[in-house]
UniProtKB/Swiss-Prot annotation:
InterPro entries per the UniProt record, alphabetical: Fe/Mn_Superoxide_Dismutase (IPR050265), Mn/Fe_SOD (IPR001189), Mn/Fe_SOD_BS (IPR019833), Mn/Fe_SOD_C (IPR019832), Mn/Fe_SOD_N (IPR019831), Mn/Fe_SOD_N_sf (IPR036324), SOD_C_sf (IPR036314)
Name of this protein: Superoxide dismutase [Fe]
Cofactors named for this entry: Fe cation
Record-linked SUPFAM superfamilies: Fe,Mn superoxide dismutase (SOD), C-terminal domain, Fe,Mn superoxide dismutase (SOD), N-terminal domain
Native source organism of the sequence: Methanothermobacter thermautotrophicus (strain ATCC 29096 / DSM 1053 / JCM 10044 / NBRC 100330 / Delta H)
């Protein structure tokens, strides 16, 4: 036995009030997304961790394949939402274009910010079913990549560093935009917190 503590996931507070992203994301939409959906991933991940803990302590068998698949889904959802809340902010403080090293890399790898925005938006709009558009950085090639993640855990490239994410699950926008995902994606650009995204990038260079 050792005295190391086993920790579990917790729902974080948002870095802004629930009405801070209006009119682009309503208070109602953000509240439900955070308190219900993000909380569900916290609960799902913790339930799987406890199930695995109990099986190990009692030396009983579990369906490892099913448990690990479900765990990756819930943990992926938990982590991606952490990035999502952090890379948004009030429209009067956010939006526009990035600056500094991130702007230089976007121009290097995409040709222009306009081209990057177009490709990222296309990745978000065309994601099949539920998923995410994700801007990442590959240290091996010193390049920015766009990933189109299905659900929370499919098409994720290992070891790529996450910079910017956009949730395109219907629960992220249906109250405000119904089934018109392109309008939601367009509105997202008004609330991107580029200072936070730039900080994420600078921290890994």
């Amino acid at each position: 036995m050792n005295d190391l503590e086993k920790k579990f996931y917790e729902l974080p507070e948002l870095p802004y009030p629930y009405d801070a992203l209006e009119p682009h994301i309503s208070r109602e939409q953000l509240t439900i997304h955070h308190q219900k959906h993000h909380q569900a991933y916290v609960d799902g991940a913790n339930a799987l961790l406890r199930k695995l803990d109990e099986a190990r302590e009692s030396d009983t068998d579990v369906d490892i394949k099913a448990a690990l698949k479900e765990l990756s889904f819930h943990v992926g959802g938990y982590v991606l939402h952490l990035f999502f809340w952090g890379n948004m902010g009030p429209a009067d403080e956010c939006g526009g274009e990035p600056s500094g090293k991130l702007a230089e890399y976007i121009e290097k790898d995409f040709g222009s910010f306009e081209r990057f925005r177009k490709e990222f938006s296309q990745a978000a709009i065309s994601a099949e079913g539920s998923g995410w558009a994700v801007l990442t950085y590959c240290q091996r090639t010193d390049r920015l990549f766009i990933m189109q993640v299905e659900k929370h855990n499919v098409n994720v490239i290992p070891h790529f560093r996450i910079l910017l994410v956009l949730d395109v699950w219907e629960h992220a926008y249906y109250i405000d935009y119904r089934n018109v995902r392109p309008d939601y994606v367009e509105a997202f650009w008004n609330i991107v917190n580029w200072k936070e995204v730039e900080k994420r990038f600078e921290d890994i260079l």
